[in-house]
Amino acid sequence: MCRPTPKKNFTKCLPIIILFFTVLRILAGLRIPYMILADQRYDDRMLFENAYDLLSGVWLGSYDAYTLAKGIGYPMFLLLAKKLCLPYSVLLALLQAVGSWLFVRALSVRWKNPYGQTLLYLLLLFSPISLTQLVTQRLYRMAIVPGMVLVVFSGMIGLTLRKELPLKKQLPWAVLTGVALAFFWQIR
């Protein structure tokens, strides 16, 4: 399956390498300690209360001056983790993996080198910003920003690089860009 030919063509091994490192990144996410600053009434705690209210079917709870102080994007991300029965860390790592894959896929129309694409994917997958304490290790809305930035830029780059192609090839990238930007706006 992954046996190199005499020419040392390793392109058949690349999907296995990608899968191995993606699983490794997800497993690493399970071992990363996460923290929440529960005393931050209008930051961390509010986002978790909003997620709980969404789960309870109360939308964003009782309406007061702080109901719309934060966007609904992060509570929806927490709700998605709950509904999919996935640990938060796994969903966060999957967001980073999907963002990395989409970014490489967006560039693939112009950049055909499979080794370079694999290297870029791995660099984005293990990006230091996606593992730092102040951003992703805190259970706060900033944790999903690195992955969502990749998704948003992937959609824009993918659409731009395919502007000469038929509409059928552009449409998935246009939809991705629209949905990603709408969700990204709600992270605020």
Where are the regions a protein language model picked out?
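Helix-to-loop transition at the C-terminal end of transmembrane segments
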Residues: 24-45
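Multi-pass, polyprenyl lipid-linked donor-dependent membrane glycosyltransferases
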Residues: 69, 91-95, 129-157, 183-187
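Transmembrane-helix motifs of polytopic, lipid-linked glycan transferases
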Residues: 88-113, 151, 155
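Membrane-interface transmembrane helices that cradle and orient dolichyl/undecaprenyl
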Residues: 152-172
